[in-house]
A protein has these predicted regions:
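Active-site-proximal specificity loops/subdomain of glycosyltransferases
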Residues: 1-5
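Catalytic core of tubulin tyrosine ligase-like
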Residues: 10-24, 29-181
Length: 181
């Protein structure tokens, strides 16, 4: 994680910073919010992802779940879900909350969690099938490999999701999305 390997994480802590909020650059609803910052600081949680109530439009988005094998909270993404489980994954009544990728971190807890793992968060890889030219389905198929920072939830005991209003999640993926604003 770049914050740790560059020394920035230790530097922030040494300068007295304790909390950090991150979000996706394309989420125009992810503005700083003093009330959320105060809640997070008072909560004592090491990590808190913002979640919204899920709608049918969010069927493909990630959500939090409890892993059966060890009871840990995890972030599940569409690309990580087997086809036979997709009907459950997309059920907004079963999984009521949508993960916004607005994340709150206690920097000391983040430093300690990374140190306990040799500096590597060990985030699960997500494999997405794509075409070299997205507008041409006959172009060669490739795999895009990525990880989601929100998956870091499984590193923290005591992570506490916080339900936020939908206005905190306004992703802009296309020019049409931008025009709607």
């Amino acid at each position: 994680m770049a914050l740790q390997t560059t020394g920035i994480l230790d530097d922030l802590i040494a300068r007295g910073y304790r909390y950090m909020n991150t979000s996706n650059a394309d989420n125009l609803g992810a503005a700083p919010d003093g009330r959320l910052a105060a809640w997070f600081a008072a909560s004592g949680a090491p990590y808190s992802p913002e979640v919204c109530l899920r709608t049918p439009a969010d069927r493909k988005g990630g959500h939090l779940a409890i892993r059966r094998s060890d009871g840990r909270m995890i972030l599940r993404d569409t690309a990580q879900t087997p086809d036979e489980d997709m009907r459950w994954f997309t059920d907004e009544h079963r999984h009521r909350f949508f993960h916004t990728n607005n994340l709150w971190f206690d920097l000391v807890a983040l430093r300690d969690a990374l140190a306990a793992r040799g500096g590597l968060p060990g985030l699960p890889l997500i494999r997405n099938r794509k075409h070299v030219d997205p507008s041409d389905p006959s172009s060669p198929e490739v795999f895009q490999v990525e990880s989601a920072l929100g998956a870091i939830v499984e590193l923290f005991d005591g992570a506490r999701p916080v339900l936020v209003p939908r206005e905190r999640f306004l992703p802009v993926k296309t020019t049409d999305d931008l025009a709607l604003l």
